Amino acid sequence: KQAETLDAIQNGADEIDYVVNLTELKEKNYNYVQKEMTAIVETCREHHVLSKVIFENCYLTREEKIALCQIAREVQPDFIKTSTGFGTGGATFEDVELMRKTLGDSVKIKAAGGIRDLETALRMIELGVSRIGSTASVAIVEELIQKNKA
């Protein structure tokens, strides 16, 4: 993954998203997960590129989410991200609350997947999300514009 990260950067990427190794995480090989995260985040930092670590929360237990947040708190990627949007579930309020509580303010959170309306987007922001990934972003902005006109 580190070589792929460097290749993407050399080909013009200014942000890198990568999914943690779920097999190693499920095996509780947290040392491996931390080393991989560190290698990718440091490669991004060296080239002034944003790093986003995707948890894919829909496949994780509460314990695994907490462990990943603790690792991220040490490694300091620019963002942690709830999901790719391709898994069995997207961002939930519960997950975002847990991530923010465990991380503190040291790492930004991107909520992705399942955010389809203004109310949900605003609630995510209230919970501490810095970015939202949504295929409904245009509809959400249009809803905000209409709300502000009223």
Question: What annotation goes with each model-predicted range?
Answer:
Residues 1-109, 117-142, 147-150:
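Alpha/beta enzyme core
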Residues 112:
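Short hydrophobic "strand-cap" motifs at the C-terminus of beta-strands
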